Design a protein with these regions (language model features):
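Short, glycine-biased loop/turn motifs at secondary-structure junctions and
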Residues: 1-102, 107-141
Length: 141
């Protein structure tokens, strides 16, 4: 995982976060850092597609998916990269943050008071289906 830290350093991650990465060298922690600092990550296109490819199979359980095809329900933190094609379902007061990048396509179904924040970057496409009780906030960069 030193290559992840090295790439973050090349992209001028702040010293505080660099030290956190050096101290906690595990995938779960790195993925949690992604969501806590997703503004920096999105601005610097981090993690890179080659890094995600290298660690495919290790990031998914922590919410980062590359070229994923399928349906996921009620997961609070998700990020899709590459050419993912997904359906995301949220209900029963679920609150979530979803980042969709590159060439990914997503259909998001929100109902029963779910609150979803979606960041759309690059050439990603999103279709929203929601009932009157759900709130969906979309930010396109």
């Amino acid at each position: 995982m030193k290559d992840i830290i090295q790439k973050a350093e090349e992209l001028n991650i702040c010293h505080e976060w660099q030290n956190k990465m050096l101290k906690h060298q595990d995938m779960k922690y790195f993925c949690e850092m992604y969501f806590k600092g997703d503004d920096w990550a999105m601005e610097h296109d981090f993690p890179t597609l080659p890094l995600l490819q290298k660690y495919k199979g290790q990031t998914e359980e922590h919410g980062l998916y590359l070229d994923y095809k399928g349906t996921i329900k009620n997961k609070p933190h998700l990020a899709f990269f590459g050419s993912s094609n997904i359906v995301l379902e949220y209900d029963n007061f679920q609150v979530a943050l979803v980042n969709i990048r590159h060439q990914s396509k997503a259909k998001i179904i929100a109902k029963n008071y779910a609150i979803i924040t979606i960041n759309i970057l690059d050439n990603a496409e999103v279709e929203i289906e929601k009932d009157p009780t759900a709130k969906v906030f979309i930010y396109k960069k």
